[in-house]
Amino acid sequence: MALININYESKTLGMPVMINAIIPQGRGSYKTLYLLHGMGGDYTTWITKSRVADYVDNTDIAVIMISGDNKCYVDNVHGRKYFTFLTEELIETCTNWFGLSCDRKDRYIAGMSMGGYGAVHAALIKPDEYG
């Protein structure tokens, strides 16, 4: 298992984005869990305040964690498009970078508090993206 910290420029958000990724060892199309933090958290919250790395160690599940910047993971009319970033750009980017499975049955989304809202919202609006 590798814990990878990435800083890259998001086209959708028009700003740098920090990502933590837990990637299994080996090769292949990994199942993927997009894990969203709650209000006041950031892309490091799940790593520093939970045992997520222990839970997925020795599995074929990759975990992707981003910062929601307390914006509830929705597109803002007069602001940034976090929902579009989460459900389109992030999936495409991480799938290409890490060799994640393209099959919706292998892609999951979850969160707590604000992240739980973002996860349910994404799963309901884009059911074709998540298994």
Task: Give the role of each language-model region.
Residues M1-G131:
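Non-catalytic cap/lid and distal C-terminal segments of serine-dependent acyl enzymes
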